[in-house]
């Protein structure tokens, strides 16, 4: 040992990649016994006399550091907020994503609120919630979930019908399934973490939990909470359980003293993709935590994702399907077009009109559309060229009836627009959004109540009364008892998007909308045929996804392989790629130039090489960050090298 005495190993709260490691600090005599693993401290940095926040990860006697250690400046709080399990999870997630552990901890540990913390320290741990009894999971064959207590990983198909709770509220069958699984986990004396995409799903799940689990046993932890409220919920998770923790993607980092269940609803929802570095998807976080904790894992959805299908195929997860007694009645209208050319050209074919009119006599009808707004895209009335802004070349659109076209990017009103191709000045509506669709339906069904639901106008629930509900994907309200008919419009437009995931994304959103229909109600898929329509109509989405995975495996597309995106200065990207060139077990696409002058390369590699590729690219990022260049015109001054950016498993890169 080079130095003896009490030593704390800390992780600085810093985004700098070169500081993504444990640093040794001496523990002053006055703080001995108080500085323990998991507390927040403040420590001095060697440069500039600055003080940084940090988490204590380890404590001990002595250090291998050759010189004198700096001492801890301040104990921020005696409350242990970073548990060993969450630290191990953050480190593992960061390493897998070629990122920094401090970035993960910003997602895992909320910002401190002093008053909340003082109240918790004064009051002590909260009393345990009343015990509950296990009751099993309805709608599935017996023993479908028996292996969860031993750490089974299950890919579960949801019961695709609305369910009425004892309280009178209606929720999706999936919410009842998760609530029953959570109740049985509590009955075994263990914690359950339930992750859902957004507040709409969370509201349903909390209603289902309220019918089965004591309120004291449920903790809500999500990004919509105010700072103090969220920190208070987080602190509750530090107390001994058992409890159920419900929230969005960050809830997967919630501390737990005895984790028994991790469950995700609808893991293909884009909201489960983390927008902050290191961009670890919620599904990957759940898989890592399940492996570390030995808890049971449930990936639940009306249709599974291609990523989950891969887990099933390699035997890592076991598929569980509900009893086939009830499934949505889906009718692809493309099969009816051969006899009517006018229907083939119509946005809403006559068969869909008839079903909507019939259903509207008795209850609500859902019309799902691709885009919000009135007319998100307009074009030249003469030559059909898409109209673009004269300032930034963004797409022009109309936001209300009689409104003037404006740019969707910069907001500039196109007062004197002229077509760049034919010089015409007249515009026509091309892409119809929810607003324009609602307007047209209102004219087609005079006297009918028309409701628009989208991101700007959220609607959560509806009574079982006649109404036309025009909703964008993911914003569909729940109707008491279920919709009397569902129309899925703009299918061709959804599939026209250039993306590797476009078909499975469409299948997921259609399946979720179909599950909102009451049993036996018609669900009409407009304008889509082939294997995709057949998969939805027969409710055998897994067969389509199985074939999709086989095609991607042949083409070496995700999730058959993993991807790393390397971008930045051309020289920095070249150096990073050189670090991988010691063997031929990966494939590099590019580099290609980007609009900002940087370049980007894509690296394809097998899962078995994931740890090695992530570590090598992380080392390249650290080398790039620690390098300094002296501008030739300014002696004595330094500037950082061009930034090198690495992202693994970007869902939108292909």
Question: What is the predicted role of each segment?
Answer:
Residues 1-331, 338-341, 358-361, 477, ...:
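Accessory, non-ATPase domains that flank or precede helicase/AAA+ motor cores in DNA-metabolism machines
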Residues 12-13, 251, 456-459, 590-594:
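Short, solvent-exposed loop/turn elements at beta->coil junctions and helix N-caps
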Residues 16, 445-448, 580-587:
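Short secondary-structure junctions
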Residues 16-18, 556-560, 595-597:
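Short, flexible turn/loop "capping" segments at secondary-structure junctions
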Residues 153-186, 190-221, 228-231, 238, ...:
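Inter-lobe coupling/hinge segments of SF2-like helicase ATPases
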Residues 451-452, 584-594, 640-647:
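Short beta-strand elements
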Residues 540-542, 571-590:
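Short amphipathic alpha-helix segments
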Residues 562, 569-573, 587-615:
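Arginine-glycine-biased low-complexity disordered regions
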């Amino acid at each position: 040992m080079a130095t003896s005495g009490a030593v704390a190993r800390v992780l600085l709260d810093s985004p700098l990649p070169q500081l993504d490691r444990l640093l040794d600090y001496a523990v002053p005599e006055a703080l001995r016994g108080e500085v323990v693993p998991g507390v927040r401290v403040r420590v001095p940095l060697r440069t500039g006399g600055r003080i940084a926040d940090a988490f204590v990860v380890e404590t001990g006697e002595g250090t291998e550091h050759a010189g004198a250690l700096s001492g801890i400046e301040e104990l921020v709080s005696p409350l242990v907020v970073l548990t060993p399990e969450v630290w191990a999870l953050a480190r593992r997630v960061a390493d897998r994503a070629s990122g920094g552990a401090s970035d993960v901890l910003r997602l895992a540990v909320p910002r401190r609120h002093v008053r909340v913390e003082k109240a918790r320290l004064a009051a002590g741990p909260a009393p345990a919630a009343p015990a509950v009894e296990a009751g099993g999971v309805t709608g599935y064959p017996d023993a479908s979930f028996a292996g969860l207590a031993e750490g089974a990983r299950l890919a579960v198909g949801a019961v695709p019908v609305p369910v009425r709770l004892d309280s009178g509220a209606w929720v999706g069958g999936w919410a009842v399934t998760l609530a029953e699984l959570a109740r049985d986990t509590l009955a075994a004396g263990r914690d359950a973490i339930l992750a859902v995409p957004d507040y709409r799903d969370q509201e349903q799940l909390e209603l289902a939990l309220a019918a089965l689990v004591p309120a004291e046993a449920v903790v809500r932890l999500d990004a919509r909470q105010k700072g103090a409220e969220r920190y208070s919920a987080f602190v509750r998770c530090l107390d001994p359980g058992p409890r159920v923790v419900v929230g969005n993607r960050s809830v997967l980092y919630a501390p737990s003293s005895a984790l028994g269940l991790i469950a995700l609803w609808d893991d293909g929802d884009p909201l489960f993709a983390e927008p902050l570095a290191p961009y670890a998807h919620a599904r990957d976080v759940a898989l890592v935590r399940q492996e570390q904790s030995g808890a049971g894992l449930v990936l639940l959805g009306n249709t599974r994702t291609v990523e989950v299908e891969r887990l099933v195929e390699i035997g890592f997860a076991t598929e569980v399907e509900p009893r086939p007694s009830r499934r949505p009645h889906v009718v692809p209208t493309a099969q009816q077009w051969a006899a009517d050319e006018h229907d083939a050209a119509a946005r809403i074919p006559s068969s869909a009109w008839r079903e909507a009119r019939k259903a509207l006599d008795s209850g609500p009808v859902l019309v799902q559309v691709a885009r919000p707004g009135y007319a998100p895209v307009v074009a030249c009335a003469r030559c059909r060229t898409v109209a673009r802004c004269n300032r930034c070349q963004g797409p022009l659109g109309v936001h209300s009836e009689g409104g003037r076209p404006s740019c969707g990017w910069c907001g500039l009103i196109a007062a004197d627009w002229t077509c760049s191709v034919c010089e015409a000045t007249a515009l026509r509506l091309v892409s119809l959004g929810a607003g324009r669709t609602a307007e047209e339906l209102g004219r087609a069904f005079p006297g009918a109540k028309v409701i628009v639901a989208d991101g700007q106008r959220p609607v959560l629930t509806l009574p079982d009364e006649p109404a036309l509900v025009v909703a964008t994907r993911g914003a569909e309200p729940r109707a008491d008892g279920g919709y009397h008919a569902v129309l899925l419009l703009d299918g061709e437009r959804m599939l026209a998007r250039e993306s590797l995931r476009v078909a499975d994304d469409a299948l997921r959103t259609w399946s979720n909308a179909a599950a909102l229909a009451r049993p036996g109600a018609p669900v009409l898929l407009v304008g889509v045929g082939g294997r995709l329509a057949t998969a939805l109509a027969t409710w055998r989405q897994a067969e389509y996804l199985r074939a999709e995975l086989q095609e991607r495996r042949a083409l070496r597309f995700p999730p058959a392989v993993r991807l790393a995106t390397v971008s930045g200065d051309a020289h920095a990207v070249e150096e990073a790629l050189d670090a991988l060139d010691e063997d031929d077990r990966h494939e590099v696409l590019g580099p290609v130039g980007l609009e900002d002058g940087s370049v980007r390369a894509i690296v394809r590699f097998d899962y078995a090489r994931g740890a090695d590729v992530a570590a090598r690219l992380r080392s390249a990022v650290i080398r790039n960050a620690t390098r300094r260049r002296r501008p030739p015109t300014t002696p004595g001054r330094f500037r950082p090298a061009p930034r090198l950016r690495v992202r693994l498993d970007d869902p939108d890169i292909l």
